[in-house]
Amino acid sequence: MCETMDFFERYKNLKEKYEEKKTKPKVIVVGRSNVGKSTFVRLMTGRKDIRVGKKPGVTLKINEYDMGEYILVDMPGFGYMAGLPKKVQEKIKDEIVHYIEEHADEIAAAVQIIDTKSFFEIVERWKGRGEIPIDLEMFDFITDLKISPILVANKMDKIKKEEWDAVLDGICEYLKCQPPWHQWKFIVPAILKEGKGIEEIKKKILERVRLFKKLRGIE
């Protein structure tokens, strides 16, 4: 949650551990299925062979891409995945959690992508069942591990422009971050299918990667 995000202190405390093991930091990409993760990875890497589909669950394994200063890690989408038994979906979710826990000390940032249009409906549906909404659970999980988040509010084209601030403020409230959203530098509104927001995301990634490396003495 926002009130506990002391990422600078985490970076500083881990510097000694990285005196000998000077590996490239990782930047993970997480989100529910069908929120635009594959589109984001294509924009970041320039690779055209990354599948982008309308059916949830196109990415079913963890893929790593060397971005020069860091490794971009594309995680499978969590939640509903088309054509997969629930047992398999749960197994994939467990693998995501295990990977993040196992590599937490190597992760400079986590890019969490949400579908802004459906976010509120899905969160309320899960809460109505007495369950923790999976988007909120993932955000809490990332920040509890003191991993610096970058929350990409994708598909903003489906929101009226005059409603953007109110919608993003509402997301802040669900994340237990006091509005207005502008004060939280980790939130980036985006329309990834049009490439809008990608440069701001790249900038935030590099800021976190370079701080991460500086505090660990990684060249």
Swiss-Prot record:
Signal peptide coordinates: none
Gene3D superfamilies tied to this protein: P-loop containing nucleotide triphosphate hydrolases
Positions with a binding annotation for Mg(2+): S38, T59
Pfam families named among the record's database cross-references: MMR_HSR1
GO biological process: cell division
Protein name per its UniProtKB record: Probable GTP-binding protein EngB
Domain of life assignment: Archaea
Biological role stated in the UniProt entry: Necessary for normal cell division and for the maintenance of normal septation.
Protein's UniProt keywords contain Nucleotide-binding: yes
GO terms assigned for molecular function: GTP binding; metal ion binding
Binding site for GTP: 31-38, 57-61, 74-77, 154-157, 189-191
UniProt entry tagged with the keyword Transit peptide: no
Family: Belongs to the TRAFAC class TrmE-Era-EngA-EngB-Septin-like GTPase superfamily. EngB GTPase family.
Co-factor requirement: Mg(2+)
Record domain EngB-type G: where: 23-211
InterPro entries associated with the record: G_ENGB_dom, GTP-bd, GTP-bd_ribosome_bio_YsxC, P-loop_NTPase
Keyword field: Cell cycle, Cell division, GTP-binding, Magnesium, Metal-binding, Nucleotide-binding, Septation
Phylogenetic lineage: Archaea, Methanobacteriati, Methanobacteriota, Methanomada group, Methanococci
